[in-house]
Amino acid sequence: MSQKSYLVEVIQYILYKLKTDCQWHMLPVSSFFTGRVLHYKTVYGHFRKWSRNGEWEKVWGIILHRYRFFLGMSSVELDGSHTTALRGGERCGYQVRNKRKTTNAIYVTDSQGIPLAMSTPVSGSHNDVYNSSEVLSELFSGLNSSGLIVSGLFLNADVGFEFAFGHYESIIAVLFFI
């Protein structure tokens, strides 16, 4: 197997993981690899290395730009995710309501549920709207740099964000002025 096809399969695996939000160890690795089946930890190692050195963000921007016509951009969804971090991690904190350590992130998806952007994870001791203006700027500037037009998008967010953004005034400012 060539290095190029190997990397394509690794990227397909990562995209599947991001779309399904399944735990790394639960993913069906044998269905992704045509040659030697890689262990999920090997694929996670690639993802972690690429994320840390900025390569994944570049690749993600290229993927979004290349396939932008397949995205459902009639509206975008904004939501938060709380992930249990039983073994700890770089950005985890105790969340009282869940009685465990968690990490939180904000996601933007298209109308089909395809992930477009994800914020930098924060400690679970913070709620979804922690540093909301900075988080939204981070999310939508990344989308802009990939060639997606975000100005004027219809944004669907849950009620927690409505409270934090004063009926979406901050979100609208971000979407129209990036």
Task: Show the residue positions of the predicted features.
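Short alpha-helical elements
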Residues: M1-I178
